[in-house]
């Protein structure tokens, strides 16, 4: 790739290091490369694409790639921001999944996907029933099956009383299981990484992006496919009756056919449904010069974009290199606007004033549930029934006033109610 001049004696340089089937081939590859792209994504497998000139017909003859070949590219920048600087983006390990040739001019494109060397992870259909397990136990067994190291970045493991894998590839089954509980999953450099989206949303931004840093941006806001609430059912362990709970509010309701194991399980599934669906509510795409601190699953802050300012989750980072340029396209989903951050801080201050020491009163605000209030004061939503029993008369009478038959064991509470926090 062509070197670009810089304002000191040392030039800015960008180039690739490519290890192909365990052999460093950059010296052989560099005269032919025309462009390279790398996509780092939350919901999809990472991908790479290399476009090459095949004027000597080496790629279509002697160097013909094969599907399943292993590539490990890295992007290297030298003297990019200051003299003597060297930055490296390790893209990971990829398998060649397709390649093509075209003429004229003679050219070759090689595409790779991040996956284990054993392709049966995504292709072979398996059937198995899991009982009295956890998400971590299931993930660990599947990871070991393909020689992957499991990285489980979830603060609390999730119990699974029973789940069935019915003629599904292991990758599809595990992805569906993780999505059910609001977990992300990704294969990267022979590691199977599982993380909690909620925990990642709570991380501090790694970078503040202002308009001067951006060469192009687009913003989109939609309610299509987004929800204010979700209904999830589970079997009451005392009488086996089906109990349906509401997470959120009823304005735009999603009703899932997924069955939960308990109330806590139903709450987590409902919260996960809303969190995943509402990631598309407010989105933004930016084109910026390379920032090595940006990667999928990190958070950034937008500042100077007016009402669009706020905290955003990085959904995808696309690196595009050619002889003339190196740009990054970054896809973001809004976690919270700056105005919403202020509302949350105000709400937290009100909660502290009303008795954040688990002794006193708390005034219900829009969006609250007994579960969320219990989690705030006690650290666990399972204490919600203690709150219900202490405030039962108030909760039931208020539900009747609002036209309900009853409160559904405390599922319906209303803004302005003053609850005793025992």
Give the role of each language-model region.
Residues 156-157, 388-409:
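Short acidic beta-strand-loop surface patches of small beta-rich interaction domains
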Residues 118-141, 152-176, 288-290, 365-367:
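Short acidic/polar beta-strand-loop edge motifs in secreted extracellular
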Residues 58-149:
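Surface-exposed cap/loop segments at beta↔alpha junctions
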Residues 2, 107-118, 150-218, 410-411, ...:
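Short beta-strand-centered interaction patches in the first periplasmic/extracellular domains
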Residues 1-70, 115-117, 247-299, 304-356, ...:
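Juxtamembrane "anchor/assembly" segments of surface/extracellular structural proteins
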Residues 76, 303-305, 375:
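Short, surface-exposed secondary-structure boundary micro-motifs
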Residues 124-126, 353-381, 385-389, 412, ...:
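Primarily a LysM-type cell-wall glycan-binding module
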């Amino acid at each position: 790739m062509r070197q670009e001049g810089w304002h000191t004696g040392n030039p800015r340089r960008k180039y690739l290091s490519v290890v192909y089937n365990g052999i460093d081939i950059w010296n052989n590859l560099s005269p032919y490369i025309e462009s390279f792209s790398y996509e780092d994504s939350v919901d999809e497998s990472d991908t790479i694409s290399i476009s090459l000139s095949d004027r000597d017909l080496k790629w279509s003859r002697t160097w013909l790639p094969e599907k399943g070949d292993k590539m490990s590219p890295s992007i290297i920048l030298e003297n990019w921001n200051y003299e003597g600087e060297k930055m490296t983006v390790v893209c990971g390990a990829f398998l060649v999944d397709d390649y093509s040739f075209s003429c004229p001019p003679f050219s070759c494109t090689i595409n790779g996907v991040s996956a284990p060397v054993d392709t049966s992870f995504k292709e072979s259909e398996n059937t198995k029933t899991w009982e009295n397990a956890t998400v971590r136990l299931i993930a660990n067994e599947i990871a070991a099956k393909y020689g992957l190291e499991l990285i489980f970045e979830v603060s609390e493991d999730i119990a699974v009383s029973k789940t069935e894998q019915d003629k599904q590839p292991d990758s599809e089954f595990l992805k569906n299981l993780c999505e059910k509980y609001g977990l992300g999953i990704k294969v990267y450099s022979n590691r199977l990484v599982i993380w909690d989206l909620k925990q990642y949303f709570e991380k501090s931004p790694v970078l503040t992006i202002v308009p001067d840093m951006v060469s192009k941006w687009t913003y989109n806001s939609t309610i299509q496919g987004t929800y204010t609430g979700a209904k999830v059912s589970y079997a009451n362990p005392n009488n086996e009756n089906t109990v349906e709970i509401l997470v959120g509010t009823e304005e735009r309701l999603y009703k899932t056919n997924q069955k939960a194991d308990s109330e806590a399980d139903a709450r987590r599934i409902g919260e996960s449904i809303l969190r995943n669906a509402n990631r598309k509510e407010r989105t933004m795409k930016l084109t910026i010069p390379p920032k090595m601190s940006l990667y999928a699953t990190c958070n950034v802050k937008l500042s100077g974009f007016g009402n669009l300012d706020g905290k955003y989750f990085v959904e995808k980072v696309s690196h595009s290199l050619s002889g003339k340029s190196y740009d990054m396209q970054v896809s973001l989903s809004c976690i919270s606007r700056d105005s919403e951050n202020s509302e949350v801080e105000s709400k937290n201050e009100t909660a502290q004033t009303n008795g954040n020491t688990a002794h006193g009163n708390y005034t219900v605000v829009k969006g609250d549930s007994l579960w969320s209030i219990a989690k705030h004061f006690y650290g666990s939503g399972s204490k919600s029934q203690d709150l219900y029993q202490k405030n039962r008369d108030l909760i039931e009478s208020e539900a009747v006033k609002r036209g309900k038959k009853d409160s559904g064991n405390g599922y319906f509470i209303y803004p302005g109610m003053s609850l005793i926090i025992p």
